From Swiss-Prot:
Keywords linked to the UniProt accession: ATP-binding, Ligase, Magnesium, Manganese, Metal-binding, Nucleotide-binding, Purine biosynthesis
Reaction catalysed by this enzyme: 5-amino-1-(5-phospho-beta-D-ribosyl)imidazole-4-carboxamide + formate + ATP = 5-formamido-1-(5-phospho-D-ribosyl)imidazole-4-carboxamide + ADP + phosphate
PANTHER family linked to this entry: 5-FORMAMINOIMIDAZOLE-4-CARBOXAMIDE-1-(BETA)-D-RIBOFURANOSYL 5'-MONOPHOSPHATE SYNTHETASE (PTHR38147:SF2), 5-FORMAMINOIMIDAZOLE-4-CARBOXAMIDE-1-(BETA)-D-RIBOFURANOSYL 5'-MONOPHOSPHATE SYNTHETASE-RELATED (PTHR38147)
Residues engaged in binding 5-amino-1-(5-phospho-beta-D-ribosyl)imidazole-4-carboxamide: 10, 74, 230
Role, per record: Catalyzes the ATP- and formate-dependent formylation of 5-aminoimidazole-4-carboxamide-1-beta-d-ribofuranosyl 5'-monophosphate (AICAR) to 5-formaminoimidazole-4-carboxamide-1-beta-d-ribofuranosyl 5'-monophosphate (FAICAR) in the absence of folates.
Protein name: 5-formaminoimidazole-4-carboxamide-1-(beta)-D-ribofuranosyl 5'-monophosphate synthetase
Recorded coiled-coil stretches: none
Domain of life: Archaea
Co-factor binding details: Binds 1 Mg(2+) or Mn(2+) ion per subunit.
Pathway(s) this gene product operates in, as recorded in its UniProt entry: Purine metabolism; IMP biosynthesis via de novo pathway; 5-formamido-1-(5-phospho-D-ribosyl)imidazole-4-carboxamide from 5-amino-1-(5-phospho-D-ribosyl)imidazole-4-carboxamide (formate route): step 1/1
Source organism phylogeny: Archaea, Thermoproteota, Thermoprotei, Sulfolobales, Sulfolobaceae
Residues covered by the ATP-grasp domain: 95-324
EC number: 6.3.4.23
HAMAP family on file: IMP_biosynth_PurP (MF_01163)
Length: 333
């Protein structure tokens, strides 16, 4: 195995930059209209431009004998689970988690089973009695999410989602208590080779107009939650033991419920309340775009490796460690 490939979006530059640092050949599989952009980066050895997602899968499968595909949010959301099931090339991480990540209710059940504090959910619109956020399935980067104060506002919002064809059925969404606090997205890497959980970074998502509404008169604009960027963050050190415990609990639950378990990067998307408690409202079971902040390494990854270590490079370091110990089967599915 000598080649690392990924889909041209999300965190692909970081992934391939890290792979080249670890001595692998790199392949970018991207929509044709992005080929010119990616061609300027010397660490990308080969670029394959596709016309549609079916062709993307064909390109991926060209490397079934010597390559590893690194998944990210665009693979989960846009290539789709049905096409992913046709991929014969090795995938780094647990591909069985994709189905869980695309279903909000299943995602939350994993968090609850891990003993992690989560927001209250409302199965029935009629039970809504506080500020809530309504979320759509999949890795859509916040598209279509909305806040509601009353059950009538929830119903109106659901009707808009159906009419705009963002959802097919009201049961597709999750209605969740809107937790007030500081958002912090805790990034982790679980290494089956080293049997170690690493805290690799923290970010805050920068969302379209919701971050500007505080400067506008009330009711002048409706908030939207489409993620357009990320802001770096560090947490008080006294919070980190709890963050680590949450991460390990989640790793243990995934190992039990979604074999072969957690492999590589994941993120617990959280709110830290004023009493110091941490409420986790979502997880991502693969590399998140917030790690792009730390291509030169994060304040936390330096503590583990004492060298520049992005999550993209950390993935390829894990592959290298597995190659050296003849344990590739432990990290690929």
């Amino acid at each position: 195995m000598d080649t690392v490939l990924t889909i041209g979006s999300h965190s692909s530059l970081q992934i391939l930059h890290g792979a080249k640092k670890e001595g692998f050949k790199t392949v970018q599989i991207t929509p044709k209209n992005r080929v010119n952009f990616y061609s300027q980066f010397s660490f990308i050895d080969e670029i394959l431009g596709y016309n549609n997602e079916d062709e993307a899968v064909e390109f991926v499968n060209k490397y079934s004998n010597r390559g590893a595909l690194i998944p990210h949010g665009s693979l989960v959301e846009y290539v789709g689970s049905e096409r992913v099931s046709k991929i014969t090339t090795k995938i780094f991480g647990n591909r069985n988690l994709f189905a869980w990540e695309s279903n909000q209710k299943k995602k939350m059940s994993l968090l609850r089973r891990s003993g992690i504090q989560v927001p209250e959910e409302f199965e029935n619109v009629e039970d809504v009695d506080r500020l809530v956020i309504v979320k759509l399935p999949g890795a859509k980067g916040g598209k279509g999410y909305f806040i509601a104060k009353t059950k009538s506002e929830v119903k109106e919002g659901l009707n808009r989602l159906i009419s705009s064809k963002l959802i097919k059925d009201v049961n597709d969404v999750i209605i969740q208590e809107y937790v007030i606090g500081v958002p912090m997205y805790f990034q982790f890497f679980y290494s089956p080779i080293l049997n170690r959980l690493e805290i690799t970074g923290i970010d805050i998502r920068y969302e379209t107009n919701v971050d500007g509404l505080r400067r506008l008169p009330e009711n002048l604009a409706d908030p939207t939650f489409v993620v357009v960027g990320n802001i770096p963050a560090v947490a008080r050190e006294s919070l980190l033991p709890k963050v680590y415990d949450y991460g390990m609990s989640f790793v243990n639950t995934v190992k039990e419920v979604v074999p072969p378990g957690m492999i590589g990067p994941f993120c617990l998307e959280s709110v830290v309340k004023d009493d110091g408690s941490i409420v986790v409202f979502e997880f991502s079971g693969r590399i998140v775009a917030g790690t792009n902040l730390y291509i030169a390494g994060s304040p936390y990854s330096w503590l583990y490796w004492d060298e520049p270590m992005s999550v993209g490079r950390r993935i390829s370091r894990e592959i290298r460690l597995a190659l050296n110990s003849n344990k590739l089967e432990v990290i690929f599915t």
